[in-house]
Amino acid sequence: MENFDKVKDIIVDRLGVDAEKVTEDASFKDDLGADSLDIAELVMELEDEFGTEIPDEEAEKINTVGDAVKFINSIEK
């Protein structure tokens, strides 16, 4: 399973949004209706899923689904 698909599954599960809405360009706040608590919980779940720690300064830069996938891809290299 690609990282995008894993991230998408987590978002659909955590936020309860339709899978079709979860695109690389989708903003967590504007397009998916996430608040700051939702985003913090998503970051924790991504950390668990990918076995990594996302520093706060990096987490603050994650505004879209694509941002999350890019970060995950960057740590797996």
Swiss-Prot record:
4'-phosphopantetheine is transferred from CoA to a specific serine of apo-ACP by AcpS. This modification is essential for activity because fatty acids are bound in thioester linkage to the sulfhydryl of the prosthetic group. GO terms for cellular component: cytosol; membrane. Residues 1-76 form the Carrier domain. Its main location: cytoplasm. Pfam families: PP-binding. GO terms for biological process: lipid A biosynthetic process. Pathway: Lipid metabolism; fatty acid biosynthesis. Keywords: Cytoplasm, Fatty acid biosynthesis, Fatty acid metabolism, Lipid biosynthesis, Lipid metabolism, Phosphopantetheine, Phosphoprotein. One of its GO terms (molecular function) is acyl binding. Transmembrane segments: none annotated. The modification O-(pantetheine 4'-phosphoryl)serine is found at S36. It is found in: Cytoplasm. InterPro entries: ACP, ACP-like_sf, PP-bd_ACP, Ppantetheine_attach_site. It comes from the Bacteria. NCBIfam families: acyl_carrier, PRK00982.1-2, PRK00982.1-4, PRK00982.1-5. Carrier of the growing fatty acid chain in fatty acid biosynthesis. Belongs to the acyl carrier protein (ACP) family. This is Acyl carrier protein. It comes from Staphylococcus saprophyticus subsp. saprophyticus (strain ATCC 15305 / DSM 20229 / NCIMB 8711 / NCTC 7292 / S-41).
